[in-house]
Amino acid sequence: MTAFTYFKDEWTPVIDDYLAKHLASEVEDQKISQIMAYSVMAGGKRLRPLLFLATLNALGRKIEEPEIRIACGIELIHTYSLIHDDLPAMDNDDYRRGKLTSHKKWGEAEAILAGDALLPMGIQWIAEGSKSAKLVDLITKAVGPNGMVGGQYLDIDSTNNASVAGDAKFINKMEWLKTGCLIQASVEMAAVYAGASDIEQVKLV
């Protein structure tokens, strides 16, 4: 097994436990907490929070509660994007990871609100854990109109635009914005948080 596999096996349960406990304890309304947790705890790979923590580990930074909170904040934001991507107005998916999507399980309005709640809560966790405006800046840029949301717009626009069908450059840009930006941000945030040098940051991202 690779070093990352060992790291993943050690830290995935920690991430899962933190997400489950804090979604239950920090969301006052039990129903919206349940709807949020349905998607967050649906068995994702936790790639983004693991990359954040693994980068910290590689840079010699000790992983404690604040670092786990930041990592889990990234996962909340990722889950928000999945809930909204699955909506009828977007990709219109009925299943994700072998389970009904949020809007199929709870209703479209409820799914929208769950996503709407996860996004700011994720940013809140990152801000609270890091005490860093720079990390908040990095995550909001990664998920905004020049990042993840921009990629989803290109995806939607491409369905009505025959001129980009099969265009490798367009597809690569769309996939980078939809997926790559948040993955890169997870590593970059860890590098900034750990105080990596400019040269180290360039090598990492």
Give, region by region, the residue ranges found by the protein language model:
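Mg2+-dependent prenyl diphosphate-binding active-site environment of isoprenoid biosynthetic enzymes
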Residues: 11, 23-205
